[in-house]
């Protein structure tokens, strides 16, 4: 540690970034070294240089704001006597033990046959008998019958459309004795047709399931007579019992910090306005490994606590061991603090929830002691690109039908989507911890899509899982453009394929086995559809290029003509169109019946629906190709990158669109040319597919433009109720986001090293509390020396993370940078301040006058 004399200009610059009085600054300006400066700040002239800089963390942090932090009882000391901020409650550990997966049914059968018992499972309760369970089973049998019956009829029509009718004209005795090529020529058309028919049946059944779900949702919402809806079980606004403590947890990882803490603040203030704030605690659970973002999170946490007086109510924790991604983050919370709460509400990084919605969820849990999870139906809002606004419109208009329909078929054995839901803590801790999947390869290891699995485990343990589809006040955001949505889809695709390994796990309820199956089909339907189109093209080539055999038997008097029944083709095509698009029409009819003013009026909502239908037709083949790639990548073991999704209105550059969509465009051109060469008349049937692929680049770019989205909004196109009459929570989120961006902290790690107050905050919030053992001290010295030598631009991520987590090393690096006036660090810090003049040089905050507040609203 350097003890060289301090340059007067360096000392003056350092003191300028501490909110001191003129007298204090003049007194400290007489220091001859930074060691002396820290000794005076710490009021300990006998302290060594290393001890002084650590001891000065408290004065540097609290100068000008000591009363505020002391009043909130936020200051404490660790086991070594170092000052720290109480950013989380005291740890009260609860045992969280995941049950190992036994996914191989053959091994279980073999162990049973050989008299070796399987490992015992944790004790589970039986869900008490209830009428809804019987009703749900009957409804699901009806759904299965409707799907299968509809598919059989459609398959029969499809069989009649195909040119080669059955295998009766294939002589299998002759096949044995004839040359192989003749066998291929004879069998090939029938094999193609059989494959096409099988694929058609699978895909039609999948479409049929969606149709019947939407239809029943339409009837539920139109009549409003759902006697089994979970939201009807609460008495209303009864007081929440003191023991019904609820933790709102927001797992984040390298997110958009201004938006995250804006939504958190809006939610906090809405809960305060509801009068139930004393029943809720808020936890930001960070898995961030970008040190700049991590420092910005620390500052944002301090800001939001000061602005809302949320000290002791809003907590922050950043993990250093990032195991099992989001589910591991939740496990860590449950292990440390879960036993202190009766319920947990999981929020996504873009989630916003009203205080009334959260209070209603707690009341519903209290009124339904057999409910383990209650999922809300979050409304998408807040984005302005044309693509996002069309998707917001689609989810807002069509989504309620499908959500209500899911509830109709599933009742208390339903979905959980991982956020905007309330969970009963005790059974979740005991039964829903996720062990890694056994084995090796792409489908082994930590579970990626945890939500469906946790819902299945909750139901297996004897607790209900419900969707409160009609509960208002739950919001989320969607990706701003097609490519960002597809990046998210790749993660979800891999996760859903992994989850299917649990299909045969013992004890899973049949409904949740079906949920695993539908999760797989959400993505597997894409390669099946693509294969269906490829085989159809191959059948066209067969009919065009292969010489037809009109006489296949000796002495045959009449030729066997390939058959074509256009009336059946038209009927089947019309039926498929009805299944695909009738739910959208029913959604608009429902809006007409309930009132269309909030959607721009009847004419505008109808026009928006037609435009969205055209847009979805354009994008369906593009998604098909991408999802096919994702499925193949998962099976080939290509890793899916789990980066945080885009949270703002970024448009797609032309260069990126060409890179991502270029192969699809070439495929569309080649496919169209092939079909035109084979049979130009067939090109009309394939035009929606190949045309969409050819146009994918401009459609992707143009739809990502915010200007077009706002222009459509001005014309009341794709309008949703949250835009027509924006809820106070969303208004506050939008304003706080703009304010946070204005004061956003950039180059956070450099500031945590150089800036006097930012360094004090980072040291006080550091989580590594190691002692003074020789190996630890040697490692600290090595890291500090490396940081001084290579500067901020040459420092690797692991060293950055280690320094940010260690208050001792970080404070020593801070002292040494200033003592040596290290230009590599200080110049970057100065440049950051000059380039970003609106970010806080210190953790100081503007007056809150004029800012929207939900407290007392």
From Swiss-Prot:
Signal peptide range in chain numbering: none
Record's keyword annotation contains Lipid biosynthesis: no
Chain ranges passing through the membrane: 141-158, 197-219, 514-536, 570-592, 605-627, 681-703
An individual GO BP term: glucan biosynthetic process
A Gene Ontology term for the protein's cellular component: plasma membrane
UniProt keyword Transmembrane helix, yes or no: yes
Subcellular location: Cell inner membrane
Primary site of residence: membrane
Membrane topology note: Multi-pass membrane protein
Alphabetical list of InterPro entries matching this protein: Glucans_biosynth_gluTrFase_H, Glyco_trans_2-like, Glycosyltr_2/OpgH_subfam, Nucleotide-diphossugar_trans
Catalytic activity, EC: 2.4.1.-
Any GO molecular function: hexosyltransferase activity
Source superkingdom: Bacteria
Record keywords: Cell inner membrane, Cell membrane, Glycosyltransferase, Membrane, Transferase, Transmembrane, Transmembrane helix
Pathway: Glycan metabolism; osmoregulated periplasmic glucan (OPG) biosynthesis
Coiled-coil portions: none
Function, as annotated: Involved in the biosynthesis of osmoregulated periplasmic glucans (OPGs).
HAMAP family, per the entry: MdoH_OpgH
Family: Belongs to the glycosyltransferase 2 family. OpgH subfamily.
Protein's UniProt name: Glucans biosynthesis glucosyltransferase H
Lineage summary: Bacteria, Pseudomonadati, Pseudomonadota, Gammaproteobacteria, Pseudomonadales
Gene responsible for this protein: opgH
